[in-house]
Amino acid sequence: MKIFRQNIICWSICCLFFASCAYQAEPLFKEKRTLYYYNIENIAVLPFIDYTNTQGVSREVTEIFTEELARFNESGVVHATAMLNYLHTNKIVITEHNIREVGLQIGRVFNVDAVVIGAVTEYDPYFPPKLGLSIEVLTVSDSETIFTTSETYDASFNFVREEIKRFAGTKKVKDSVYGDELIMQKMDLYIEFVSYDIIRKNL
């Protein structure tokens, strides 16, 4: 019985290890990633500002980006719903002018080390899709910007399609279709891809 129990434990550990490894398209040294380098143990993602004025996009991008960040990093991530509920309860409206101030305020309320401030800069769901995201990571203790980027993923370019294929390879499950064409046809999957790629390479 003791040997059986040890085997079960070892098998469970192996499954968790391979599951985490399988999600990455290629190995990256975590020492080079921002959250590890700055010893960020917990983080919150503010609702993305939507410069495209597309209904529902801010919430969708915020939720998907938060889920990808939680899936990919060892850091604890405040769920997007908790963040949205706090803002709604306290009647706080985020704008491009107050987002840093609100971010630091929320960071202290939720007792996190850093906050992600994001914006949707481009959004075109029609084939080939296009999505632009601006991301800034701000430490709560000293208001320092430890990472910033602004990128546009235009699926009409071959190099973007190669990254989509790489991402699709990490998501394939037996007897299910999750190919690169489907990712370019469904905008929620495309948002997931863009979030994944930015987080994988930087955070």
Regions found by a protein language model. Give the residues of each.
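N-terminal post-signal-peptidase region of extra-cytosolic proteins
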Residues: 29-31, 47, 97-103, 117-121
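Solvent-exposed loop/turn segments connecting transmembrane beta-strands
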Residues: 54-56, 122-129
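Bacterial N-terminal signal peptides that target proteins for export
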Residues: 1-10
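Soluble periplasmic/extracytoplasmic beta-strand elements of cell-envelope proteins
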Residues: 42-47, 115-119, 132-137
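N-terminal segment of the mature soluble domain
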Residues: 52-115, 197-198, 202
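C-terminal/domain-edge helix-coil "capping" segments
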Residues: 21-41, 109, 130, 140-203
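Acidic/histidine-rich, surface-exposed loop or edge segments in extracytoplasmic proteins
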Residues: 40-51, 82, 86-88, 173-174
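Bacterial N-terminal signal peptides
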Residues: 10-19
